[in-house]
Amino acid sequence: MATFKTLSSADIKTTRSNLNQLIDFVEEDVSGSATRKKIKVFVTGAADAGGNIGSVTSSIYQTVYDQDFTLQTSNELFDLTYGVFKNSNTVTSCSSGTDINGKLLFPSESLMMREKVNVYNQMAQGLLGTNDEQFASPFGSTTNENKIDNALFINLKRLFVRDGIKRETFAMRMYRSASAAEKAEDSALTTDGQTNIFRETTSGSIIITDVGAASSIERSNFGGDVGNLVNSANTSENLGLIFYQKGIVVLDIEKICSGTQLMSGTIGAVGNTTSTTPTRANLIPDFVVSASMDDVVDHFASTRFGKGTQTFLTFQNNTMINSTLVFCRATADEFNFSSNPTYTDADGRIVCIDENSQGIQKSFSFVTTVGLYDANEQLLAVS
């Protein structure tokens, strides 16, 4: 037979503990084309003067995997995309106005500008609460020079973020400039106009970190805890934001990169039958306006993070473990009976008898199973 004992509040204890795990991503994960998955959701077509049709297809974001994404064992690491604020100089300088419904209009020389604006709006809506709000670093700054017009978004996957990123553990290495395109930039070049859109660079790297975030706690009502990302060599230089619970990094492209650097190479263009057209202009605004989302992301992924086996991004995640401990206390002489058939003889008399020091014989038993029941005596758990 079972013996029941009612539990009191003193027998139940709830605890919360944190488990931290070190995460790091290597350069070749983000730079390799086989580890970046593109889902083509945008396509456009136009006729040139000769009536030939050319089109550009592109994704809105790219997902980076830890190995070839076609393998079943591959894991999603993060999403990478680009967005631009709707009232920024990048947009207003190339927009031809709006239609009667308020939709932004752009000339054919630009590509996917509405999609780039929509990405920024979506991120602002989810992290700041409204798509009219603009990201700024330091967080909440109202100074124009701290506003983020052109943003590179890194959306880390929940598999690695878990319940959030631990403050002051985030660090990322990035190259501020692409390979040189002109002899004026690099005297080693034999000719001007070398293509550098998708050519890696090996110098000029910086470490972007959230050092100091623990002493300056910022919070968004919609995005959770926020940290300011700075240059590790000059912590007064703000480069972006990190939303710890969301696992989203927002980088100010105009500060992490040289926006005036000349870009040379080929990008997709509307009405071009070869799907490419040469470009040789500044990174901002020319390249980010003229290139598709895939071309912009391909440039950053293939040239700005390196291509080796070294770590380019690392952080510690935080897993919250909620535990409820139920103490089943058995005091002296409690539960001294067993339903095991060997506990009694054929006549029903208890055979498990032990004589104590006073010569008093008492029965004894060993607890083998403990059941946890609710108020209706329904079994909930067994130990």
Tell me the role of every PLM-derived stretch.
Residues M1-S383:
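Long, position-biased, composition-driven segments near the start of the mature protein
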